[in-house]
Amino acid sequence: MKSDLWYFLLFCFQVEALTGEINDSTKSEMFTFHDGGVQILCKFNAIVSQYKMELLKGTEVLCDLTTTKENGNTVSKNPKFCQSQSSSDGVSFFLYNLDSSHASYYACQLSIFDPPPFQRKNISREYLNVYESQTCCQLKFWLPIGCAAFVVVYIFGCIFLCWLTKKKYRSSVHDPNSEYMFMAAVNTAKKPGLTGVTHNLELCGTQA
């Protein structure tokens, strides 16, 4: 049951890729959905032997990939945060576990080391809008309230149950038909007056 709830919360986060122009309704070529995350494709057609591709969120470098095509060596920065993969048409970065704080402009910055001269340029830049659905926002608002209400009701239920149990026990003790009633002590000693009366009756019978 708990796993189903977590899956539902994860699906509440919806990611929508938008271009830099607000009125542009064309499909984004930079962002695509991939295994619950977003694939950011940085395309370039230059023939280079060694280059570095950096993924920028605003002005912050999230991760980069350096490739030497002669040796086939690649070095990726921050592999835990984002994964990278080089291909014939460019470099792909994969971002996962996105939330609303990741909404920003993302840019691909290419640095060419070989062939010379050294060059650095931004080859693509688009805005990634990550928003939380209204259902998820309502759930995140009402879930703590519901949990708190459940705890309060549970505590009061336990208190009421204990009080009811004690009340039933006390009523069973004071009930005269209860098997737990204490038996009163009975005094079996004979009274002297009654004995005298008995003797007098015997004497009268003898005289007669």
UniProtKB/Swiss-Prot annotation:
N-glycosylated. GO terms for biological process: cell-cell adhesion; T cell costimulation; T cell tolerance induction; T follicular helper cell differentiation. InterPro entries: ICOS (IPR039943), Ig-like_fold (IPR013783), Ig_V-set (IPR013106). Residues 162-208 are cytoplasmic. It is a single-pass type I membrane protein. Residues 1-19 form the signal peptide. The keyword Ligase does not apply. Gene3D superfamilies: Immunoglobulins. Residues 30-132 form the Ig-like V-type domain. Residues 20-140 are extracellular. One of its GO terms (cellular component) is plasma membrane. Glycans are attached at residues 23, 122. Disulfide bonds join 42-108, 63-82. The keyword Ribosomal protein does not apply. The chain crosses the membrane at residues 141-161. PANTHER family: INDUCIBLE T-CELL COSTIMULATOR, INDUCIBLE T-CELL COSTIMULATOR ICOS. Stimulatory receptor expressed in activated or antigen-experienced T-cells that plays an important role in the immune response. Upon binding to its ligand ICOSL expressed on antigen presenting cells (APCs), delivers costimulatory signals that enhances all basic T-cell responses to a foreign antigen, namely proliferation, secretion of lymphokines including IL10, up-regulation of molecules that mediate cell-cell interaction, and effective help for antibody secretion by B-cells. This is Inducible T-cell costimulator. It comes from Canis lupus familiaris. The lineage of its organism: Eukaryota, Metazoa, Chordata, Craniata, Vertebrata. The gene is ICOS.
